[in-house]
UniProtKB/Swiss-Prot annotation:
Keywords: Cell membrane, Glycoprotein, GPI-anchor, Lipoprotein, Membrane, Signal. It is a lipid-anchor; GPI-anchor. This is Ponticulin-like protein C5. Residues 1-20 form the signal peptide. The keyword Membrane applies. It is found in: Cell membrane. One of its GO terms (cellular component) is side of membrane. Belongs to the ponticulin family. The keyword Cell membrane applies. The GPI-like-anchor contains a phosphoceramide group, rather than a phosphatidyl group. A lipid is attached at residue 118 (GPI-like-anchor amidated asparagine). Glycans are attached at residue 118. It comes from Dictyostelium discoideum. GO terms for molecular function: actin filament binding.
Length: 147
């Protein structure tokens, strides 16, 4: 029974360490309107920044409690500071780094760019996870041998 519990704990720990949440720092947007400058060249939007993109003034705000779910706001052409109430807004979630979101009458394609400043998502994160998984496996093996 103790062996089964140790194996179960090992499996849960490995799964938990490999499923660390990915955070996103900015987005690249395009849309399907032929007249838009975003059709061939994606425009990068930064979180919490008022920017002009795709012939619109846009603002992407994070939703409280989530690092992959955001609110995409569209403002009027004159509102260069995104100070007024958005003309339209919609929430989207980054799934596998890509998403589509409808804002008003326009559908945007959004490519979510991972936040590389997050220490758990650095370029060496895969090797770190492998090392952590190996350490957990060794710890579980030692605890089983001690039984």
């Amino acid at each position: 029974m103790k062996l089964n519990n140790s194996l179960l704990l090992l499996i849960v720990a490995i799964i938990a360490s490999s499923n660390a949440a990915e955070t996103f720092s900015n987005f690249q947007v395009t849309n399907s309107e032929a007249s838009s400058p975003c059709v061939t060249t994606p425009v990068e939007l930064k979180v919490n920044t008022c920017q002009s993109a795709c012939d619109s003034i846009l603002n992407v705000l994070p939703v409280t409690g989530s690092t992959s779910k955001f609110t995409f706001n569209q403002f009027g052409a004159q509102d260069t500071k995104c100070a007024a109430t958005p003309t339209s807004s919609n929430e989207f979630t980054c799934v596998d780094g890509k998403s589509k979101v409808a804002i008003g009458t326009t559908t945007y394609s959004v490519v979510c760019v991972p936040d590389k400043t997050n220490s758990s998502e650095s370029d060496s994160s895969d090797s770190t996870r492998i090392g952590a998984s190996f350490a957990l496996f060794a710890l579980a093996l030692l605890s089983m041998l001690a039984l």
